[in-house]
């Protein structure tokens, strides 16, 4: 008997897709399509359009994969550049081992052959030489000196005493003396000196001279010629030098002459030691004739210019003059007042010259303004 198989067109049409192929027999996409990001191969058309569409995505994908490879290689290079710490060596130091071996060999050479203890050192026993041996040297040469440790049975001689420091010579290192004085004290010393020098003026007092000085300084301050007071210890020493070398007691017969001479010294001191460039002449002028004032100034400049320069350049000379001014007040206090007679001025000038001549003294001052 035969079997008849009938196929209906409807059932066959259901199992087909519009493309004309059944679903079961549809082929899976190749592996290349998955690598292309799921893009399937387009159907081949006219003039090779399918091949050109396939080539364009492959170029893009190759560029992307190249960038990924470059980034991965850069990361590897960075990781390889990291310096790994060198592990500490756990083995013994070869230099230390070599030193240990050398120490062991040295100990073996120094010690005895069979024992492990070292031999005791031989100490020479001192012997007392005979008189003949000490007096008569051997015929072969000169007498040999005894060893330093033996000393011939006698204790070693004591070491020589240390040399004492010799006293300083009179003209050697300077002697340091502290001189302390305030501005008011130096003003009184200056007044006492002028009163003793001008012995012919019986009614002159130290306060009168200080009043002349302070009057000039106050006038310059009020008129605006200076910003600060001129009366300081250093300036008082300068004024004392000028007064000591210019004032003559036998030539000054009145207080007016003394005031004119003293104000001339003040004018030179202000011009030389003051902070301003120039000062007015009116506070320093008490006489109607200006020519006499300028003549006194020129005589003092020609005669005392080296000493004025030295007072600023040589600290030893300055301290000597400072001490002389301080001594003027002490002399007045010891005598009880300004002495009379020409012997006082002669003694004062001679003591000042003697104090300036002694160059070995160095005076250290504390100036209290």
From Swiss-Prot:
Cellular location(s): Cell membrane
GO biological process: cerebellum development; hippocampus development; layer formation in cerebral cortex; neuron migration; positive regulation of calcium ion-dependent exocytosis; regulation of cytoskeleton organization; superior olivary nucleus maturation
Entry GO MF terms: actin binding; cyclin-dependent protein serine/threonine kinase activator activity; cytoskeletal protein binding; lipid binding
Ranges for region Disordered: 1-55, 72-176, 330-369
Biased composition regions of type Polar residues, renumbered to the chain: 1-11
Basic residues composition bias: residue spans: 74-84
Modified positions (Phosphothreonine) in chain numbering: 84
Post-translational events: Myristoylated. The Gly-2-Ala mutant is absent of the cell periphery, suggesting that a proper myristoylation signal is essential for the proper distribution of CDK5R2 (p39).
Chief location of this protein within or outside the cell: membrane
Keywords: Cell membrane, Lipid-binding, Lipoprotein, Membrane, Myristate, Phosphoprotein
Biased segments, Pro residues type: 145-171
GO CC annotation, single: plasma membrane
SUPFAM superfamilies referenced in this protein's UniProt entry, alphabetically: Cyclin-like
Lipidation (N-myristoyl glycine): 2
Topology in the lipid bilayer: Lipid-anchor
Basic and acidic residues: compositionally biased ranges: 99-112
Low complexity composition bias: residue spans: 122-144, 331-352
Function: Activator of CDK5/TPKII.
Family stated for the protein in its record: Belongs to the cyclin-dependent kinase 5 activator family.
PANTHER family assigned: CYCLIN DEPENDANT KINASE-5 ACTIVATOR (PTHR23401), CYCLIN-DEPENDENT KINASE 5 ACTIVATOR 2 (PTHR23401:SF3)
Record note on quaternary structure: Heterodimer of a catalytic subunit and a regulatory subunit.
Protein's recorded name: Cyclin-dependent kinase 5 activator 2
Species: Mus musculus (Mouse)
